[in-house]
């Protein structure tokens, strides 16, 4: 039509071109409006057709982490009457943990966590071995907690250790089984106190008197003091009362899955009386403290320490009342010359942050742990290969590649605290890790 108008002289060529341009712009504008209306309509339809999850599903939180590790050990041993041996061992290992927490009511929570490992209480590591065979998964946590008030929480089942403590006596992988109570109160704006109680099961014995099962009662009282805006001091005293240990009967001391077998292998000779009942006793005090300082250095720094003493350890009594039912000769204890071997201590520091991408963190401690200071079955499984009668250095560095991905390097440089009974055992260990949280 515009061309006809130009042919009849009613429109000039320039006027016709201008009119065509305006018409094209109007056409583009209308197309954009139609497209926008269609998009908005699609959004509204998506809102009305979106699947709404049940409220109980929204209360569930899932989490997990994967750790890939290269682990090298260098060991030098010289047992009494034998030649010195040296060897080193390389292993490629992993740890996988998958957890779920559900807020069942305003005051209650249920949690479950699965983990890799061999089933031992103080490790979740699993080696890549056995020509690619499948790996086992265990129940690492299964608990219910109730918080009836802000100052009180009660947890039952297999749960996280609530105690303020150190790896000198508790490996972080140990999740006690039983009931725990945690209380905390603010005395002033700068001073708070806390208490943790534990009633935890050690063994379930196949005997008629179920009240005699070995049990641990833990009592902890501590305080948190805000010395200044950037300085916090935390300390606690804990008593561990191991009950009914004399009901444990002599068994296969080579079975490291048992309480007596694990302890016996890891420097704690288990001694039995003429009725083949365990004589070893544990009634342990632990004192721990940590000082946290911020804003003095470019990164936070912490100083910490721990001391443990088993007041029930008595080498003379073990030698006097003990017999040798098969693989536990009390005469071997003569080499300790009456020393009860009942204490241990740790001091260290950490520096850095471990929260987000670009953060770095470093930690160092030195420790000494005598044979009978605390049950070997619960202490750090990596330091000196696990167990007691050790001393040495621990150092670790971390760098956060992403908020949820970190690279770690850990070193253990250890030896026997006392070589008089079991001989020399020096062990150095390097672990290189990549840890991914999800």
Language-model regions, residue ranges each:
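Detector for outer-membrane/organellar transmembrane beta-barrel domains
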Residues: 106, 226, 230-386, 391-392
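Surface-exposed coil loops of outer-membrane beta-barrel proteins
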Residues: 119-142, 146-228, 234, 238-278, ...
